[in-house]
Every structure is written in C-alpha cells, then in structure tokens.
Amino acid sequence: MKTHPQAILLCVLFFITFGLLHVVEAGNQEGFISLDCGLSPNEPPYVDAATDLTYTTDNDFVQSGKTGTIDKELESTYNKPILQLRYFPEGVRNCYTLNVTLGTNYLIRASFVYGNYDGLNKELEFDLYLGPNLWANVNTAVYLMNGVTTEEIIHSTKSKVLQVCLIKTGESIPIINSLELRPLINDTYNTQSGSLKYLFRNYFSTSRRIIRYPNDVNDRHWYPFFDEDAWTELTTNLNVNSSNGYDPPKFVMASASTPISKNAPFNFTWSLIPSTAKFYSYMHFADIQTLQANETREFDMMLNGNLALERYRPKTFATGTIYFIKPQICEGGQCIIELLKTSKSTLPPLCSALEVFTVIDFPELETNQDDVIAIKNIQNTYGVSKTSWQGDPCVPKRFMWDGLNCNNSYISTPPTITFLNLSSSHLTGIIASAIQNLTHLQNLDLSNNNLTGGVPEFLAGLKSLLVINLSGNNLSGSVPQTLLQKKGLKLNLEGNIYLNCPDGSCVSKDGNGGAKKKNVVVLVVVSIALVVVLGSALALFLVFRKRKTPRNEVSRTSRSLDPTITTKNRRFTYSEVVKMTNNFEKILGKGGFGMVYHGTVNDAEQVAVKMLSPSSSQGYKEFKAEVELLLRVHHKNLVGLVGYCDEGENLSLIYEYMAKGDLKEHMLGNQGVSILDWKTRLKIVAESAQGLEYLHNGCKPPMVHRDVKTTNILLDEHFQAKLADFGLSRSFPLEGETRVDTVVAGTPGYLDPEYYRTNWLNEKSDVYSFGIVLLEIITNQHVINQSREKPHIAEWVGVMLTKGDIKSIIDPKFSGDYDAGSVWRAVELAMSCVNPSSTGRPTMSQVVIELNECLASENSRRGMSQNMESKGSIQYTEVSTNFGTEYTPEAR
C-alpha cells in the first residue's frame, strides 16, 4: 500500500462556535424556496404533513407550461408536492426565474415523477440547465411509473437571479414536480471551481429512516447504509454536538459504524460516472462512546492507497467533518476510503456519515446583469410574450432570444446585448426608457409598430449605437438635435407622419451627421484631397530615395511612425509638452524609458508624460511599438494614451494620469498600505488579468506584453487597475502557425524560464510573469531575496507549501482578515501559472475566471472567527463540548 504523507498539502480549519454560529430552529425556513410545480395559482400555500415544509405554487416563477396530475392509482405513493406536475409542450427552453442572494451557496433540488400523467406509459428524457449551463440529463426510464428522479446540486450564485431551465432534446415533453432551494452557510461546501453535483449522502446505521427537514436544518436528504458483513453499529442516547457549520442532523451523529474485527480497517467504496470525474467528499465523525482512561481511538485515513490524514482522533460527543480542499480523482473511477487503526489506538475506527459530490464546471458566463435587467424591463413594458424569451438572453448561443444579437467573444467577460430587433411586434406606448440601460447596444430596430410620444434624447447618449430604425410608427414632436448631430449614427424616422423633421431629417441619415445627399459633396472633396496628398507623397519619395542614410544613424524617414498614428491620436509638439508639464516641474517617477512627469492638457485633464532619455535602455523601436499598440487597443484595464511627441530627439508618450501610482509602491508601503487589504489586492490583480487577457484574445493579431510586473500595474483614484508599459510587447502566432523566435526581453525574476531557455515567445510567458505578481500580492515578499534559502519567490513558496507552512507565506499585514478559501485558491492558481512548462500553465482567460471567483468568495465572506493551520489537502472542522477551547492535532 502506497503512503505519501507529504504528497498533498494539508490545511486544518477550526471553527469556534460556542454553540451560536449556526442556530436554526426547527420550523425556521428563512430563505427556503419550496415550489409545488403545477399547483393551481388559486390554492394557498400549504404545509406538507410529512416534512412541515411550506410549499407554494410555481405560477409566479415560470411564464410557460401546462399543469397536470399523476395517475390517481399512484397518489398514495407520494407526498403532496409530487402529486401535481408542470409539463412544457411548447418551445425548446422553458425556465424558472428565482430571486436569490448573490454569492451564496444554495442546495438546489429538482424532483421528477412521470406518474403516467398523460396515460401514455412512456419514458421521458430531457436536459436540465442551471442558468446557461448543463446541469443534468433527466431520464425517467428507471423510475417510469412509481419512482422519483431527483437532481441535486450545491451552487454558488453569481447574480441575484437564478434560472432553472428544462430543455427539450427529442420527442419527450419535459416535466417537473417540485423545485427546492436551500441557502447554506458560505464557509461550507466550497470548491476551487465549479459546483457540486450530488452523488450520495449516507449515514451508517441499521435504521431504515430517510432523514431530512426538520431534523436537518438545511433539508439535506440522508439515506441509511450498513454493511452487515463487516460492520457493527454504535448508538447513544446522549446529546452529540453537531454544530460545526456543516451541522449534520443529531439523529445521524447519534449512531456510527465500526469494523466487527477490532483490527480491521473501515472501508467504503463507490464508483464515479464518468470515470474521469473529480469529486469532493465530506466525512462526519463523533466518538459516541465514553472512553476509559486506558482507551484511545486514533486512525489514519487513506484515499485510494495514499495517506491523506494521519492520527485523527474524533472528539467525544462532538462532530468533526473531514473534507478535501482540492478535488480528487480515482483511477478507473473506482474510489475507496480506508480508516486504519494506528499502533497507539486501542479501539477501531468509526464513522457516522459520508457525503460525496462530483464537480461540474460551468463554462458559460451569464449575460451582463445590467443588460438582463434592462431587457426584462423592456419585455415587461411591452408585454413581449415570445416563447424564446426565457432564461439567459444571450447564452447558450443556440437559445439566444429571438430578435437579439450578443457579443460573447471573450470567455472571461459576460456577454452583452448589441442588437435589439422588435420590429413588427405590435408594440404600443412610448419608447421604453429601459433601452438607455443597454449600454452596449449598436443596432436598435423598433420599426413598424404603434409607438407614440416623442423620440427620446437618451438615445443620443448610447455611445455604441450605430443604427436606429424607428420608421413606421406614430411618433410625434421634434427630433432631438443631439440625435441628428450624432456622428456615425444611421437614423431612420420615415413614416412617422406626426414627427417634426426639419430639412428632411426623417429621411435615412447616412451615419456621418448629415443626409445622404451631403455625402456626394464630401466624397468629391475627399477625392481631390487624396489626389493632392498622393502626388505630394510620391514627389517626396523620389527626392528622399536618392539620399543615403549612414549606417550608424537612424534617418527621420526610417523613424516615421505608422501613418495611422497621426489620424488616430493627438500629436503634440515639444513646446506643448514643455508647457503641459510646466517645464518638467513635477516628477512622478523614473523607469527604463526615462523620467515621468505630471502634466495637464487644456488646463483640465491631468496626464503623465513619459520622456525618452538619450541614455535609456529602450529606444525608438520600443517607443514606436508602444504608440502603435496603444492606438489600436482600448480596454478599461489598459492604460490609455492621450497623445505623443515625436520631434527630433524629443520623444514622449502622454498617458492618462493614474493618481494612485503603481502596485509596487503600495506593496512597499510608500502609498499607505492600510488600503491594500486582501480584497483590494484581489480586485487589482483580477482587473489586471482582464487587461492582459484582452491583449491575448481581444487584439488582432494577439499580443504578448513581455514585461508584466507590479510596477507596470497602475492605479487610478478609485484603485481601478490598468496595465501599462507596452514597449516590449510583441504579437504572437495563433495555433498552427510558426512560433516567434525573439531576443529575450523582460525583467529578471518575472521572466519565463522556458522563454529564456528557448527564445520561443507565446502568451504563456505573460502567464508566468502574472503568477509572480500573484505571489507578490499574497506574500508581500520581494521577487528575489538572496537571504532566503530559495532566493526566487516561486521556489521559496513551493518549499513552504511542501513543508505545510501556509501561514509563513501569507502577508501578516492581513491580520487574518481574509477568506481562507480564496487565499488558497489564489496560491494554487499562482503556482500553476509559474509551472516550469508552459503547457502546464492556465490561459489568461482561465486565470480571469478563477480570480473573479476568488473575489466573489471574499466579497461574500461573513464574520466567522476562525484560525488556520497548515496541514495539507484535508480540512476538518471540530466542535468542542467545552466551549471556548480548540482542538489541536499532533504536529507531524
């Protein structure tokens, strides 16, 4: 049998509860949603006699479907919530919409009983979605007539609205009998990523009872299991304290199973489907025997032959829960947990209960919530009753709402609505004010309806809007001048006979701020100007071609920037640069490029002016690269270029001013370190990651930054992060193209060792550098420190983790004010980013998703007192009956 006591990192987490952390009285159903699907809306809420749970009709939570009842001969088999059902003969996707608390773990359970409601005696198969992602395939074949098919999942909400959708996949008509949501404590059932799909939940007893609410305050269902050939049962009538956050029912913890043979192991096996699935397990222990002075119960825990936890001693009459902090896999999908008595133990191991969940990753992000709220308001305003207008508006793409187009190009950014077409939809009333909240809208078509009132001025404020078609309505009044004068907008107001349209402005506008006929004049003028410019350029070319350029001098011709520069951004003269900086009065900083000065443009806009020093390690090539990159990329997390100066030997870049300096200054304490708590640091790196992900996936061609570090992450007055310093940036090849062989460039410590060794550049080089940044914000340690046993930060953190010393790497300035799970996830993410092999590193898209989940976890953290010790890949929670004391394991 293999033993690897240091193969997996251990973390031991203790909850001091004083019996008060999770007080939920029987009968308290706060936050519960219990829907009897198909119950008549005329029936009031009722209390189910079997469970004391209050159920209501689902009528207010779903906009489609018909109701039915199971065969009367089967009614005696089921509780009342199962007797009715809702079925969906129309449409492909039909959804329930439920209001939830953002960032909260919910146990979500859907139950299905066909019950021959239609008299056809057939099996059903359809898909169940949670938001835009597949949750489960529902097949009633096994339980065709008299069984309940149940799907359960524990899911952390990413918005204030949760949608559960039934998807028709073939000839079967989807059905549902009940839908239940139960909020859980946020510090329980956490995952690194994804959600937990229920596999089984057993308590080890000879009892036949299924335990649920009110015995379980969270309404989990516990099923008995007992191996008669290998186990014997222990029971107690004494009180067992089960309040450890997971709070298994007292009835469950009042019994336990132990091997019949005193020296035999306690074994439990199960299978995973598919065999490659990852899982989390939660084992609940309590020693329910009063031990004598000469008695000891101590055991090791093995998973698939590997040592996971040593010398565990269950507390007497108090509950401990052991679980993995990282998802596990089993070879061939066959899993076995063994509890082995140690040499010190006089008693065999025992266990009360085990829960196992498989991990489901949900890759699709929900549509931007502002857009969702806006389109729902528009739907309600006009009473749009399209069958497809259910669930997420944009994703999955095959279920996108009719009349919408969305931008879902970036997997790390929520999709946004860019096109709304409600033409010929029998709309009445005024133009809905909610349209102004679709801030990414590019095309709006409300033509051929019966809209009245005026053309609202807010349409001119939609910056992305390129096309508005309001033709064929009954609009009246004057057209706002701001709308008529908006450049780049194509406006069609034809057919509105009551509309006051000066100068024929109701005719389709050309998109350049004037009518189509004006375009002819513009084209003529532009054509003449183009001929003059081309002629002049040809003459200059013939003159300069005759001149020779000395080898040791860069000519002004060869130094010319891309011609697009002068048309896209302002080019400043050197005298203007001197004026804006007040003769270079205020220095903001110094870098490899040169000095950076404070300045103002037009006596209003603050800017940062970076001057190229003649002795700079960077030169005109880097200057040109940075200007040309910043002129073609625009992202909220990339520093914006206001302009540049290229006059003789005077080269400068004029950026937007970042009032809070760079991240490194704050990490060193130069700018007031009290602001940089864990949440703020997470927010900064999450935003920086979004900027870097845009360079990799949003640019054409995609770009590698090549110099990601804390000094190149700048912060504005609101501590919004923006990536800066693009002088070393290079494009990189797409998959299938030839790799780029470059001269190695970057900053020591942050430089990808694989890139340094091979000279082959790809986007994973940035991922490595970003991993170093992550380690900096977690540890607040220098990247290179020769006084450490391992000078480089990645090697040092790796050694500390191998020793199980997590506390030594976390910045003590946090003072324990952080979500332990989010810190662990960030550490593991950082270590995956600095994998020596680029193929083992995540993409920046994956990094963004992981950091956003860490941030969501930190944001949803509640005030629970807890201490953290490093012990490995297992966490466990203990409750002592002597309130105010902690259980501490032996040192390894």
Curated annotation (Swiss-Prot):
**What catalytic reaction does the record list?**
L-seryl-[protein] + ATP = O-phospho-L-seryl-[protein] + ADP + H(+); L-threonyl-[protein] + ATP = O-phospho-L-threonyl-[protein] + ADP + H(+)
Q: Which residues carry this modification: Phosphothreonine?
A: 573, 742, 747
LRR repeat residue intervals: 375-396, 399-422, 423-444, 447-467
Pfam families (alphabetical): LRR_8, Malectin_like, PK_Tyr_Ser-Thr
Residues annotated as binding ATP: 588-596, 610
The UniProt record lists the keyword Phosphoprotein: yes
Task: Say which enzyme class the record assigns.
Answer: transferase
Q: Which residues carry this modification: Phosphotyrosine?
A: 655, 755
Location (main, coarse): membrane
Q: Which residues are glycosylated?
A: 99, 186, 241, 267, 294, 407, 421, 437, 450, 469
- Record's subcellular location: Cell membrane
| UniProt keyword Repeat present | yes
How far does the signal peptide extend, from start to end residue? 1-26
TM ranges are 524-544
| Stretches in topological domain Cytoplasmic | 545-892
Question: What SUPFAM superfamilies is this protein classified in?
Answer: L domain-like, Protein kinase-like (PK-like)
Q: What topology does it adopt in the membrane?
A: Single-pass type I membrane protein
Q: Which GO terms describe its molecular function?
A: ATP binding; protein serine kinase activity; protein serine/threonine kinase activity
Alphabetized, the UniProt keywords read: ATP-binding, Cell membrane, Glycoprotein, Kinase, Leucine-rich repeat, Membrane, Nucleotide-binding, Phosphoprotein, Receptor, Repeat, Serine/threonine-protein kinase, Signal, Transferase, Transmembrane, Transmembrane helix
Q: What is its EC number?
A: 2.7.11.1
- Tell me the active site: 707
Instruction: Pull the Extracellular topological domain ranges from the record.
Output: 27-523
The UniProt family comment states: Belongs to the protein kinase superfamily. Ser/Thr protein kinase family.
Q: Indicate what this protein is called per its UniProt record.
A: Putative leucine-rich repeat receptor-like serine/threonine-protein kinase At2g04300
Question: Which species is this record about?
Answer: Arabidopsis thaliana
